Amino acid sequence: MIDIGRELQVAINTGKVIIGLRETKKSLLTGAPKLVIIAANAPRWAREDIEYYAKLAGVPIFTFPGSSIELGAAAKRPHKIMALAVVDPGQSEILKLVEHA
């Protein structure tokens, strides 16, 4: 079983992760991310936007099992995070989340 919080932290430290709904949507338009993570309590309009852009870009989506507050805590940030995009996983194995989902 993959520890999502640990792998997310490794990806942030060793790779490139874009944080925030607006920035994630921008990155999806360029097709840069390899994975998008969205909080389970994200509003329907936000989830639909992300799913639409991710489908166009061919990027998999992983729904974080916790709230946006918990996703922020997992990323070691002092604020809520509704969505984030993993552009470069670095040394983490975060892309394996898609295989297990």
Curated annotation (Swiss-Prot):
Cellular component, GO annotation: cytosolic large ribosomal subunit
Record PROSITE patterns: RIBOSOMAL_L30E_2 (PS00993)
Family that this chain belongs to: Belongs to the eukaryotic ribosomal protein eL30 family.
Organism: Pyrobaculum calidifontis (strain DSM 21063 / JCM 11548 / VA1)
Ranges in a coiled coil: none
Keywords: Ribonucleoprotein, Ribosomal protein
GO MF entries: RNA binding; structural constituent of ribosome
InterPro entries linked: Ribosomal_eL30 (IPR000231), Ribosomal_eL30-like (IPR039109), Ribosomal_eL30-like_sf (IPR029064), Ribosomal_eL30_CS (IPR022991), Ribosomal_eL8/eL30/eS12/Gad45 (IPR004038)
Domain of life of the organism encoding this protein: Archaea
Family matches, as PANTHER family: RIBOSOMAL PROTEIN L30 (PTHR11449)
A GO biological-process term: translation
Name of the protein in its database record: Large ribosomal subunit protein eL30
